[in-house]
A protein has these predicted regions:
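Residues that form or flank phosphate/diphosphate-binding pockets in enzymes
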Residues: 107, 201, 389
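Residue-level signature of beta-propeller blades and closely related beta-rich strand-turn architectures
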Residues: 77, 110-111, 157, 204, ...
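Acidic surface patches and DE-rich sequence motifs
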Residues: 65, 116, 155-156, 202, ...
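Short beta-strand segments and strand-loop junctions that repeat across beta-rich extracellular domains
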Residues: 113-117, 154-172, 206, 312-320, ...
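Beta-sheet repeat architectures centered on beta-propellers
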Residues: 1-102, 231-246, 253-472
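Beta-propeller and closely related beta-pinwheel folds
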Residues: 47-58, 84-93, 122-292
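Hydrophobic or amphipathic alpha-helical targeting/insertion segments
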Residues: 96-131
Length: 472
C-alpha cells in the first residue's frame, strides 16, 4: 500500500474557459524552505494585521527618513512622522516621496513640495527673474527621487528631468538643471536611484545617468550610461521598486505582453510564471499602470508585493531556488483585494497603511486575522494519477495548539481540475493540543485523476506541511 507525498507549494488544475493547465497558487500562505518531518518545506499563514492608529485617510505613500530616523507616511490629506501630523498634503492619489538632510519631499499634484524639518513648507519653483539664473519650463512633476545632495524629478509627458540646487533645494540648479532621456520620446514614466546612478524608466527603455564630476559653470553634471540601458519599460509610475540590490518592475505592453522582471547589469531576468503573466495580461494597459509594487523582508522571506486593482501577488525570492514561488493575498472570505499597503519596518514591528479605511496597522505573527476578522487560507495539491485506486488516510502535518477555540479544516477533491466537490470538515486546531492529527481516513475510490483543496478559516496562525495519502 504505497504512500504518495503531495506538494502544497503550488497546485495544478485546468481553466474551464480554454482547457489550459493553470497553477492554483496558495492564498494567504507563504512557503518556507526548511526540512520539516520528511518535507522540504512548510507553508505558513501571512501575518495578521492589528490596528495601530487612526489617521486622516487611506494610505498614499510611505518612506523611511534616515535623516530623522523616522517613518514618514502620507494618509489622506496629512503627512505623518511616526504617528504625529507634520503637514498637509493636497490631492487624493498616490504620491512619490524622497528625503534629504533638511527636508522631506512629496511629489503631489504636479509639484515637488518640501516639508522642512524646521516646520516650513516650500514648493520647488524657478529662481526669481532678477537673479540672472536660467528660467526653466518646469511643467508638472511626475515622480521624484534623491541622489547625494539633490532632489531629482521627472517632468510629466516629456523626456526631461531636473535636479535641484545644492544650496537652495527649493529651486532648480542655477547652471545645469535640465537633462533628457533621449531614448524615451514618449516621456519618462518613473525615476529612481540605484547605487550612484539616476535611473529613468520609460515605456520601452530604462536609462541610467551618472555624475560627470564636472565643476565648470554650465557643464553637464550628469551623463547617460548606454552600457547599462535596458530594452524594457515599466507599466506605470509605481510599477517599480528596489528589490534584491536592483529594481523589480512590471514591464510595459509596449515591449510585448507584460511580465515581472528584475534588472541586473544591463539585462533583465523574468521572475513571473505563466499564471502570473495570465493575470497581468487580463488588465488593460491603463488599468495596469495603476499598479503599485513594494518590497518587504521578515523571517528570511524576501518578498516582492504587487498591488493590482483586483489582485495582490507576492513573489518570495527566498523560496524560489527551484522556480519562481508566488502566492496570492486577499481579504475576507471571498475574492476581495488585500487591504494593507505601504509596509515598512518601524521600531521593532512592521507597520502598514490601508486601502479601505482611515487607519494604520501593524503585522502580528501570532494571528492571521485582519483587524479582528477571520481570514480564508487556501492550499492546493497538483492533479495526480490514481487509476482505479482506493484512497485512505489523507494526512497533513499541522502545528496546532495555539487556537482560541477548535478550528476546522475543509478538504475537498477534484477529478477534473476544475470542479471541487463537497467539503469534508476535519478538526485541525484546538487550544493546547499541540500534537493533533489532521486526518481524513476514508477518501474513496478514484476512477482516474484526483487533486485536493485545503481551506482554513481562522484568526489563528496556520502552519501546514507534509501532505500524504495512502493508495490501494
Amino acid at each position: 500500500m504505497p504512500i504518495q507525498q503531495l506538494p502544497l507549494m503550488k497546485g495544478v488544475g485546468k481553466d474551464f474557459r480554454n482547457a489550459d493547465y493553470i497553477d492554483y497558487l496558495p492564498v494567504n500562505m507563504l512557503a518556507t524552505p526548511k526540512e520539516i518531518l520528511n518535507s522540504s518545506g512548510y507553508l505558513r499563514s501571512f501575518p495578521g494585521i492589528a490596528k495601530r492608529s487612526d489617521v486622516n485617510g487611506v494610505s498614499r505613500g510611505v518612506e523611511y527618513n534616515m535623516a530623522q530616523n523616522a517613518v514618514y507616511r502620507v494618509c489622506g490629506g496629512k503627512l505623518y512622522k511616526g504617528e504625529s501630523e507634520v503637514g498637509d498634503v493636497a490631492g487624493s492619489g498616490r504620491v512619490s516621496m524622497a528625503h534629504g538632510r533638511t527636508s522631506q519631499a512629496v511629489g503631489v499634484n504636479g509639484q515637488l513640495v518640501e516639508y522642512r524639518y524646521d516646520g516650513t513648507v516650500k514648493t520647488v519653483s524657478n529662481w526669481p527673474t532678477d537673479s540672472g539664473f536660467t528660467q526653466y519650463e518646469l511643467g508638472s512633476v511626475r515622480d521624484i527621487t534623491r541622489l547625494r545632495g539633490r532632489y531629482a524629478w521627472s517632468k510629466d509627458g516629456t523626456d526631461s528631468w531636473f535636479i535641484t540646487d545644492l544650496e537652495d533645494e527649493s529651486h532648480p540648479d542655477r547652471y545645469s538643471a535640465q537633462y533628457r532621456a533621449e531614448s524615451q520620446p514618449d516621456g519618462i514614466i518613473g525615476i529612481g536611484t540605484w547605487r550612484d546612478f539616476i535611473v529613468c524608466f520609460g515605456s520601452s527603455t530604462i536609462e541610467y545617468f551618472s555624475l560627470t564630476g564636472a565643476t565648470t559653470v554650465g557643464a553637464a553634471l550628469y551623463v547617460a550610461q548606454p552600457s547599462l540601458m535596458v530594452q524594457k519599460g515599466i507599466a506605470g509610475t509605481y510599477c517599480k521598486t528596489p528589490f534584491a540590490d536592483s529594481y523589480a518592475f512590471i514591464s510595459n505592453p509596449a515591449t510585448g505582453a507584460p511580465s515581472v522582471y528584475i534588472i541586473g547589469s544591463g539585462q533583465v531576468s523574468p521572475i513571473a510564471s505563466a499564471s502570473i503573466e495570465k493575470i497581468l495580461r487580463s488588465y488593460t494597459a491603463d488599468v495596469l499602470a495603476d499598479g503599485v509594487m513594494e518590497s518587504l523582508r521578515f523571517d528570511a522571506h524576501e518578498l516582492l508585493i504587487i498591488h493590482l486593482p483586483r489582485h495582490v501577488l507576492v513573489y518570495d525570492a527566498s523560496s524560489s531556488s527551484n522556480g519562481p514561488q508566488w502566492c496570492v493575498l486577499k481579504t475576507g472570505l471571498y475574492d476581495d483585494v488585500y487591504r494593507a499597503i505601504d509596509f515598512i519596518y518601524e521600531g521593532n514591528q512592521i507597520t502598514c497603511g490601508d486601502k479601505l479605511e482611515s487607519v494604520t496597522g501593524k503585522l502580528q505573527f501570532d494571528i492571521s486575522s485582519q483587524y479582528g476578522l477571520q481570514q480564508e487560507h487556501l492550499l492546493f495539491t497538483p492533479l495526480f494519477k490514481a487509476d482505479n485506486a482506493r484512497c485512505f488516510d489523507l494526512e497533513v502535518e499541522s502545528s496546532t495548539g495555539v487556537a482560541q477555540y477548535a478550528d476546522r479544516l475543509f478538504l475537498s477533491a477534484t477529478t477534473d481540475g476544475i470542479n471541487y466537490g463537497r467539503e469534508q470538515m476535519i478538526e485541525q486546531n484546538e487550544p493546547f493540543v499541540y500534537d493533533k492529527r489532521v486526518l481524513w481516513k476514508r477518501v474513496g475510490r478514484i476512477r482516474k485523476n484526483v487533486g485536493f483543496k485545503l481551506r482554513v478559516i481562522t484568526k489563528s496562525p496556520v502552519t501546514l506541511s507534509g501532505c500524504s495519502i495512502r493508495l490501494e
